[in-house]
Amino acid sequence: MATSMLGSVPGPRPFGLAGLFRRRPPRDPWERVRRLPRLSAVRRSVAAASGPGIPDSHLYCLELLRKRDYESYLCSLLFPAECQRSASALRAFNVELAQVKDSVSEKTIGLMRMQFWRKAVEDMFCDNPPHQPVAMELWKAVKRHNLTKRWLLRIIDEREKNLDDKAYRSIRELETYAENTQSSLLYLTLEVLGVKDVHADHAASHIGKAQGIVTCLRATPYHSSRRQVFLPMDVCVQHGVSQEDFLRRNQDKNVRDVVYDIASQAHLHLKHARSFHSRVPAEAFPAFLQTVSLEDYLKKIQRVDFDIFHPSLQQKNTLLPLSLYIQSWRKRY
C-alpha cells in the first residue's frame, strides 16, 4: 500500500504533543491564540491612524489575504510587530499575481496585468509606485527593508510563463516553478526579517519547492472540475495514468501511486529543509510557519491512502491557528 511506503521513509521530527511539553507551555494556548489581533481590531487602529474617509492600503492587503490566502493571513499575525505590515504586503502581492490566471478569459489580458506589475515594480524602485493598494504597500516594504528587485521580477516572470494552461512536463519543471515563485517569496520574507544567512536560504529553497508541490496537489480537484490537469506528466506516464483518469476522478491504485510519488517529493523537501534547523537563525523562523499547513496536508493525504479527491482534504483545519501559535512559540519549522 502507498501508505506503508511513505511510513517506511524516515520522516521529519515528531510533531506530537509529547515533544512539546518538554518545555513549559503556556497554561492555555487557546488563550494566546485568542489574543492574536483580529481584523476588526486592525481596522479600528487603522481608521484611527488614517483619519475618516482615507482608504488604507495595509487594511486592503489584510482583507485580500483573509479572503484569498487565509493561511498566510494567520502567519502574518505571528511575525514580529515591526515586520507584519511588510510581510502581509509581500503575500498580498503574491495573491494578486496568483489570481490573474483564474480571473482572465484570454491570455492577452493576463499578459497585460503581468506587465502592469512588472512596470509597478520598476516604478517602486524609482519612488513612483502606482496608486494601487498592494503596490503602495509593497513600495513601503521595498523602502523599509531594501528588498531585492530581482526576486520580485522573477516571481512575475514565472507567473507569466504559467499563464499557458499546460501540465508540467516533469516534477523538475514543477520544482523550478516553485523555486522561482514560492522560494523567491521566502527570500524576500527573510529580507523583511533582516536575515542574511546561507542556511536560511537553503531551507527557504526547499520549503518553497514543497509549497509549490503541495499547492499543485491541493488544487487538483478544483482544476479537474474545470477539465484541467497540471500534475507532472512524467510521473503520470511512469504509472500509466492519463489526464482523463484525473478528470473522471479515478481512484485506481496507479492514480494513487502518482499522487504518492508527487507528495513524497514534497515530504522530501520538508525533510531537507529541517536538516538545516540547528544552523538557521531563530529570527528566520516566522518566514517558515507555512510548514505547519504543508505537513498537515501531507499527513491528511497519507491517511486517506493518497486519494487526492477525498472530501476530507477540502475541509479547513480549525486547529490551524493553535498549531501555528504552538510552532511559533516552540521556534521550530
Swiss-Prot record:
Report the InterPro entries cross-referenced here: Isoprenoid_synthase_dom_sf, Squ/phyt_synthse
Among the Pfam families in the record, one is: SQS_PSY
Domain of life per record: Eukaryota
Using the record, list the residue span of the signal peptide; answer none if the entry has no such feature: none
Record bears the keyword Amino-acid biosynthesis: no
**Which Gene Ontology BP terms does the record give?**
biosynthetic process; mitochondrial respiratory chain complex I assembly
- The UniProt annotation puts the transit peptide over 1-44
Q: Does the keyword Mitochondrion apply?
A: yes
GO CC terms: mitochondrial inner membrane; mitochondrion
User: What does the UniProt function comment say about this protein?
Assistant: Involved in the assembly of mitochondrial NADH:ubiquinone oxidoreductase complex (complex I) at early stages. May play a role in the biogenesis of complex I subunit MT-ND1.
Family listed: Belongs to the NDUFAF6 family.
Q: By what name is this protein known?
A: NADH dehydrogenase (ubiquinone) complex I, assembly factor 6
